[in-house]
Regions:
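Phosphate-binding active sites in nucleotide-utilizing proteins
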Residues: 3, 22-26, 68
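A conserved segment at the C-terminal end of the G1
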Residues: 3-15
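Fold-independent oxyanion-binding glycine-rich loops
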Residues: 8-9, 27, 58-59
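Short beta-strand-centered segment that lines the nucleotide-binding/catalytic pocket of NTP-utilizing
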Residues: 12-32
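Flexible beta-alpha connector loops of hexameric P-loop NTPases
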Residues: 13-15, 59-68, 92-98, 135-136
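Nucleotide phosphate-binding site architecture
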Residues: 22, 62-63, 131
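Conserved C-terminal guanine-recognition region of P-loop GTPase G domains, centered on the G4
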Residues: 31-51, 72-187
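Activation loop entry of protein kinases
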Residues: 54-56
Length: 189
């Protein structure tokens, strides 16, 4: 999910796999924006570029990473260098409690370096396209309810700060422009 998202945002050539921990070291890409704020595609070489944003795809953080489980400290050191963080959470039907992933990420970041969670700019609910589809037991109403519950959970987790939740599909590029605009607006503050 994260590597696919990096490819959508920056056209980077990150390895994508259908198994956990495909990414073992950071991958980098550059988002490019035009004068009107739209994100350039790789083909937009002749247009006037106004802003760039470097994006890093980090290896997944697991429970007890802050205690150096796995390659925890090595991965967390990379995250520490980032000025803004986006949590990419599996929001598909096989993950009934996506908010638990947010809690784990917050706990690991905060235990590793207090204040690191203040850099979280948004939560991307990835695989949102899988909810309410024709070959899916979820109905559209179930999907809306799951998203509403998730947004409420995220609000409580980050309170008093507001961290937006944007449902996306990196694979199908659903809401990628919306996410890019939000990140760009955070960089110009």
């Amino acid at each position: 999910g994260k590597s696919t998202l990096l490819r959508c945002l920056s056209r980077a050539d990150a390895e994508v796999g259908s198994y956990s921990f495909t990414t073992l070291s950071p991958n980098f890409g550059v988002m490019r924006f035009g004068p009107d704020g739209h994100m350039f595609s790789q083909d937009d070489r002749n247009e006037h570029e106004m802003q760039r944003l470097t994006v890093a795809d980090m290896p997944g953080i697991i429970k007890d990473a802050s205690k150096n489980k796995g390659l925890g400290h090595e991965f967390l050191r990379h995250i520490e260098r980032c000025s803004m963080l986006v949590y990419v959470i599996d929001f598909g039907p096989t993950n009934p409690r996506p908010s638990s992933e947010v809690l784990i990420l917050n706990r690991e970041l905060e235990q590793y370096r207090p204040g690191l969670i203040d850099r979280v700019a948004l939560v991307a609910a990835n695989k949102a396209d899988l909810l309410g589809g024709t070959h899916n037991p979820y109905t559209e109403e179930d999907a809306r309810e799951k998203l509403l519950r998730f947004r409420q959970d995220v609000d409580m987790i980050f309170e008093p700060r507001s961290v937006p939740v944007i449902p996306i599909s990196a694979k199908h590029q659903l809401n990628i422009d919306r996410m890019a605009k939000h990140l760009q607006s955070r960089c110009t503050l």
